Amino acid sequence: MAAFDPILTGFPGLDQALDSTRLGDNVVWRVSSVDDFRYFVGPYVEQAIRDKRNLIYIRFAQHDPLVEERPEVKRYTLDPNVGFEPFTIEVHNIIEREGFDAFYVFDCLSELQVAWAADLMMGNFFQVTCPFLFQLDTVAYFPVIRGRHSHDAIGRIRSTTQILLDVYRGDGTYYVQPLKVWNRHSPTMFQPHRFDGTRFVPLTEGHAIGRFYQIREDLPDSEQHLDSWERFFTLARMQYEQGMLSESSLADMCRLLITREERMAELILRHFTAKDYFRIYKRMIGTGTIGGKSCGMLLARRIAQTNMPEYTDYFEPHDSFFIGSDVYYTYIVANKCWDMRIQQKTDTGYFAVAGVLKDRLFSGTFPPEIEQQFREMLEYFGQNPIIVRSSSLLEDSFGNAFAGKYESVFCVNSGSPEERLREFEQAVRTVYASTMDPSALEYRRRRGLDVKDEQMAILVQRVSGTNFGNFFMPSAAGVGFSHSAYRWRDDMDPSAGMLRIVMGLGTRAVDRVDGDYPRLVSLDRPDTTTMTTMAEKHRYSQHFVDILDLTTNQLTTVPLAQLLPHLPQWYKYKVLEHDFEAESRLRQRGRYREVCFATCQNLLSNRAFTRMMRKMLHVLEENYGVPVDTEFTVNCSPDGNFSVCLLQCRPLNSGGGGEQSIVLPQLDESKTLFHTQNASMGGSRHVALDIVIEVDPAGYCGYPYARKSDVAHCIGKITHAFAGQEKKILLLSPGRIGTSSPELGVPVSFADIAECSVLCEVSDSSAGYMPELSYGSHMFQDLVEADIFYSAIFETEQTLCYRPELLHPFPDRFAELAPEFPELSGIVRVYDVGGSGLSLWSEMISGEAVCGIAEGE
């Protein structure tokens, strides 16, 4: 049959009143109960069977079936609780398989609120499903319950469907009022119609019309127009105020607002009060959950403040807003990207379609009702800087950190209201688009998360800091770990925790910075550093600061020396040290100026601060049951006080290494590749190696600067060649692995080294290469989650032995594995050591790591 051809509905009078239902029509019946819909769907089913139609029933609701089981009807039973995306894609796949001219009955759309909690997602489902049905010239019946949905939700249905009918029951019969009939018209089509047993008679006489409107008026809840989200929280608030809020209602609020992940939900329910949920609800934009990052931040704050009452005045309060996860899919649907999203979820389109979809997400528009909520939020913040942070459903959960995989964007927020709105909306687009970044896609696929529902919620935080004239920043910021797997002294206690702290914005602590060295702090010995001389302290310290520039309206990195004239003396005292030796040399030449570097030394000398951080990290680990990773800022005042703003907390997957018993072999030096002490991360383990990739420091140093990235690509090519072979690979690389400055090390991405089991950063002072663990950086998080062992090979007493010549007798497979990089032969070597007995042993308690060949291995 051709598109728009008339079909029979089982009600000849209705066919006449509507000028026939047509192929391509989606017919939405707004009813007071599902039973009212049954009255009309029964004849439709019988007529379709008589006409030998391909009849399909989509079953997903809790109400009794609308169509009985019979051979002539195909039934698909689906579960909307799996999530919007899997459910909607499965419906799409069914429709695609059934093809053209199919006839459908769907369960009540209002029941989707039970699974998805809000109108927003029900409307999204209809807006993506209805057009696909239309394209295939189908006919589909959908019931929806009157009074359960917002005006906006019904408006979205009205704008998408071809036919919308209002059904009322009264005086022993049914009334039907067409609200929309696409591409059809008659003088009485949109009048209320009364069913007299055979015909649908339009009401034109005054008494009959008056009686119809009286029936409408008498219906309960007919004008409520609240969706289930609003109804639920309104009722919960009333129950709370009356002292009648149940434990099950608290569990429902946790599920709807915060998380459905079992371990996180258990912690939330243990620590949150009813007021906590209502505060979140009050600061929500849209609906859905607030995502993993927001969940972790709020949970950590509640745990810390409950268990550390003596530090209450030292915690900076938060006033964050949360863009619900439903808004992400609403944005995709509103910008007509859903078909592309479905293609991207396939095996062939997973990477291929992602780039195009990313561009579309980066340039979309927001629905007016969402944009209005953005405006109201920005009015609250005024011209205070804010940060727009990813908070996906799976992010920062047990086992999945997603560290650095999604974007966070600072908004300096200093322009006019319209300028600030444009800046903010672009920041949200950037976060949404980052879900299609190759690194995020690869991360999800490697961890088996590519088939899971991964909606993107957003956390909007006021940037914690101080205005220093033309720039804005906190006094200090950093990352804190409740357990340190990296010690540089025998007498350090890993359970005391560790900080990686910087002056200014914390981006220099969580990202692997180039040319700078954040301060590494063991909280049992906060004054201790790895450096012994003033020259070393100066060289391996922070010389650049990340700030928000209020004149250029952007995040900027500036040299510390450029900031010095603008900093008050009390602040300098807290975070800076003077290189008195350098200042003395300058004075001898008749030059008088400050030579400073940032170490946060006097802040760390404040025992109130370090004791607070140590206790906070301990309390969080104790309650989470695993080590945790946090982000924080510190703001100091001229009178010596300080406040800590806890920005983020996530459980740290500590990998396969641990405190299990490992006996280090006593190797002859001639059989030792390296032996380090207090320079590794990854716990106790034994790894029998198959492949060693070595990058020669001198060769890499002499290689043309503009082509040093070739070395990174080459390493990626080699490691990918071993994918799926379960080979144990060791990479020896000069300087910093993963730097973006090739003069400091090889600029590999994590994807280039993800197949490795062991990484070693090798020091070479003659070439200027210096390892840096970057504890707390996103690269560090990737190593931890992938269970990759790390060691630094310094030119200090921490390295007891390093003999790369041990590898030279082994066959070099470079030419075989990287033939397209002949110029790198001799710079990159690929030693096949399989079966040789070359192994790594690491013992966590002593902090020693040994790699070599033991007898009998």
Language-model features: locations:
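Substrate-engagement module of ASCE P-loop NTPases
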Residues: 115-116, 121-148
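A conserved helix-loop-beta module that forms one wall/lid of the active-site cleft
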Residues: 278-343, 348-368
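C-terminal regions of RecA-like/P-loop NTPase motor modules
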Residues: 2-4, 184-221
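Phosphate-binding/switch region of NTP-binding enzymes
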Residues: 145-200
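Flexible inter-domain linker/hinge segments
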Residues: 202-279, 455, 463-471, 550-558, ...
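Conserved inter-motif catalytic segment of the P-loop NTP-binding fold
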Residues: 50-114
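Conserved mixed alpha/beta core segments that line enzyme active sites in large multi-domain catalysts
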Residues: 147, 265-267, 271-310, 365-764, ...
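Glycine-rich P-loop/Walker A and Walker A-like loops and their local beta1-loop-alpha1 context
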Residues: 6-62
